[in-house]
Amino acid sequence: MNKEVLDSILPTMDTNDIVELVHNHLCGLRVMENKDREDVKVEYGLNEDIEDNSREELINALYKMNKKINSR
């Protein structure tokens, strides 16, 4: 999904939905980069337990992960 799509859907999502989207992006990046899930979390500034991140931290990580995914 592109940045414009994220811009439009994130304000309508609750934190649980954003956590789920982060998990999905992590799975995609883990496969694309052939890295351990924990390494990918660290790379994008996420806590071990995704749910322990603030909404802002989750959204920032999503934009970074989304940019990486779209650059491939």
Q: Language-model features: where?
A:
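Short amphipathic alpha-helical interaction elements located at domain edges
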Residues: 1-72
